[in-house]
Amino acid sequence: VKQSTSKKGPIENNRGDSVGQFDVTVRMFCQGLGDCFLITIPQADVRPYSILIDFGVALGTPSADIIMKQTAVKIAELTQGTIDLLILSHEHWDHVSGYVLAADKLKNMKKTKKLTFKHLWVAWTEKDGDPLADVLRKEFNKAKTALTRAFDSAAGLKGVDDTSVRRLQALNGVLAFYGLGAAKSGGS
């Protein structure tokens, strides 16, 4: 296992395992609590096939936008700008926030370093037109809206007891998985 670190950027753990006639490289970008894996598979006479699984960091991570922009640049360098398959495992903020946090970097990269995504896989729950997925998404979005309103309402109360504060913090933790809550707007 090779590991390279940088005080200004993400930590990258590499593990290359030999599989048959070729080597597969799996890179885990450790940018705090969050997920981002890059798998590269050599191909004869062409650039390696690249698979990116998730691209995020936990809500409230210090300098998250800088970290994710640096990670995007590193991924562009390692893939020669092409991700053959992007897999988004699920919609939690720590799995998808990089696309929001590094959006301007992804859009404004020089042509030679720009990231292109050829194919996208998402969870079945994200498929428009799937009757069950559509119902689940609708109900889930209603619940997120209700939780956000409850949090916003409770956060404005004065003289709240310790038990209520702990409950409010727990609710904020749930909201943080979806990129919502106080941590998004700079609160605790």
Residue ranges and their predicted role:
Residues 28, 32-35, 43, 57-59, ...:
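Short, flexible loop/turn elements at secondary-structure junctions
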